[in-house]
Amino acid sequence: MVPHLHRLTLMGNVSNRFTVLEMEQLRNAAAALGLKVDTLEIRQTQDVIKAFEGLRDRADALYVCTDAAIIHANRIQINTLALHEKLPTMHGARTYCEGGGLMSYGPNFPNMFRRSADFVDKILRGAKAGEIPVEQPTKFDLVINIATARALGLAAPDKLLALADEVIE
C-alpha cells in the first residue's frame, strides 16, 4: 500500500516495557525486510508534537506502538500530525484507525475483554486462578481507513481490501 517505503519510524511510549519489547520485535522484522528503522521515544504528552519536527525528512511511514496511556490518549493528534506530514501510519488496534490512522492489525480487544470476563466468572465460581490455562488472542483484525488513504494519495489494493475485517470510509 506504501510502495515507496524504505524508511520506517517507530513511535512508542518507552516508559512502557511492553512497548520497548514491541519496538525491538518491529525493529528486527523491519530490518529483515531491508527497511531503515528509526525510533521516536515518547515519555510524555509534550513529546508528541516535538517528535514530528523534521520527521517527514527522515521517514516514509510511521508505526505507532499501542499503549494504553500516552499514545492512545494522543492518537487523534498523532494521526492528524502524521496526515499533515503526509506520513502513512500503521497501528496495532482499530481505535487508532477510527482516529484517522491509515491501517491497523492487531488483536480484537472486545473479544479479549469477553474472554477475560469468562476467566473472572470461573474464578468467582471457585476455580483457582493459577489452574486456568493462559490464552493467547485468537482473533486479529485488519482495519483500513480509506478516507486517510485518499488524503495521502494512496490506493488500497483490492486484494488487501478483501482481506480487511473492516474498511472505514
Specify the residue positions occupied by each region the protein language model found.
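Short hydrophobic alpha-helices and adjacent helix-cap/hinge residues
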Residues: 1-169
